Amino acid sequence: IKYANTIISYIDKVEGLDESIKNEYLGRAYFHRAYRYLNLCFQFGDVPFVSKIIDRPKQDYKSTKREAIIKKLVQDMEFAVQHVPDQKDMTYIGMINKGACRQLLIKCYLANGEFQKAKEQADILISQSGYKLMTETFGTFSNPHPTTWNITNNVIWNLHQGNNKVIAANKEAILVMPNRYGSDSGIRTRTMRNLVPWWNATSISTPDNKLAVDRFALTHASYDASMDYNRTFGRGVGVEIGRASCRERV
């Protein structure tokens, strides 16, 4: 919200900026602010609405009515839909595009009880914006661990393959933000560490003080490919192989 407000507050002071470019980036800033505030309104109801840069310590925040915030978000997103370009007219993937703005405007209309307007915008998004539901297989198919988890080629699998996320054949993608390890777009997250322990660490023990999880090398005599969910689903987020002493608890 702070970064969005920075753009909103200062964009008119940028000398020599073309009006269409200014409105394009202003619309994107409105998107980012509206996206966060819509989530806050649904999570907490009335919240303080900060629409400008806070340049000094402030402790007297007062909540704004949820209904008033949503009405403001509707106005902002109507502007964004008008001025932010379609993805096909943009150079970069990952920046806010018109389709994403329209989708957020639909949600704002629904939150504001303007159901007919929401339907009209949804019809445009579905039928007139170049998007459609994928019904046939497409893109790259991979079946990397057939012994553990054999995959038959299908649309859902194709949709969730990293190589298929941003290709032109994927017509379901409205706003895609690539985040790939080792690339310029890679942003490391701590989701895995926040949700599960470092399960293959030798310091994790069962209540009876035994090693909690076995992690066998591929060449180990006890390695069983049919149980290797770690390599199949990714770093232990699937099913882990526990010792007999902790299986009942699992």
Regions found by a protein language model. Name each.
Residues 1, 99-105, 109-249:
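An aromatic- and glycine-enriched ligand-binding surface/loop that stacks and positions planar moieties
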Residues 8, 48-50, 81, 173-177:
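Structural recognition of the beta-strand scaffold that forms the well-ordered cores
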Residues 51-58:
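Short linear capping/connector segments at secondary-structure termini
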Residues 40-49, 133, 183:
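Proline-centered turn/helix-capping motifs that create local helix->coil transitions or kinks
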Residues 1-44, 60, 64-68, 78-90:
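Conserved, well-structured interaction surfaces
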